[in-house]
């Protein structure tokens, strides 16, 4: 097993990601080819530092940009998901005195809205339709992590 793959294995990468990674000689090569934004965000999350750190805030902004890809799938008139993203972006930019607790409260409201708003099948389709776009967003804001 390649050293870079051993490193992501130690971080707890899922079996599917590990199998996919075997096709690549290096993390930068895999990073450039990856179409799974969720995997990329997961890896950055494992490496970006403690909650509240600058590295984490940059990652949160990237994640918010990815989350915005799902907004077209939100039921018309339902504002909680968009508001949650906006609160989270404000926190990441150190604007308005937003706390992690504020984000958690907003996210709970958005999750409650999502529970009744869409069928499981529609959510599944929406999720997979934006993974490649999310991967492109991640690459635009983050270089491949170092081995």
Task: Pin down the residues of each PLM region.
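Short, glycine-biased loop/turn motifs at secondary-structure junctions and
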Residues: 1-147
């Amino acid at each position: 097993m390649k050293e870079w793959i051993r490193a992501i294995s130690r971080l707890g990468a899922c079996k599917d990601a590990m199998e996919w990674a075997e096709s690549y000689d290096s993390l930068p090569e895999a990073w450039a080819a990856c179409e799974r934004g969720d995997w990329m965000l997961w890896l950055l999350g494992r490496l970006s530092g403690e909650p509240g750190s600058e590295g984490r805030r940059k990652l949160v902004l990237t994640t918010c940009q990815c989350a915005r890809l799902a907004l077209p799938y939100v039921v018309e008139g339902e504002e909680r998901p968009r508001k949650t993203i906006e609160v989270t972006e404000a926190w990441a930019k150190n604007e308005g005195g937003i706390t992690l607790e504020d984000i958690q409260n907003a996210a709970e409201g958005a999750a409650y809205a999502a529970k009744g708003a869409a069928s499981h099948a529609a959510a599944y389709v929406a999720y997979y339709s934006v993974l490649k776009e999310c991967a492109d967003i991640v690459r635009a804001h983050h270089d491949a992590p170092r081995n």
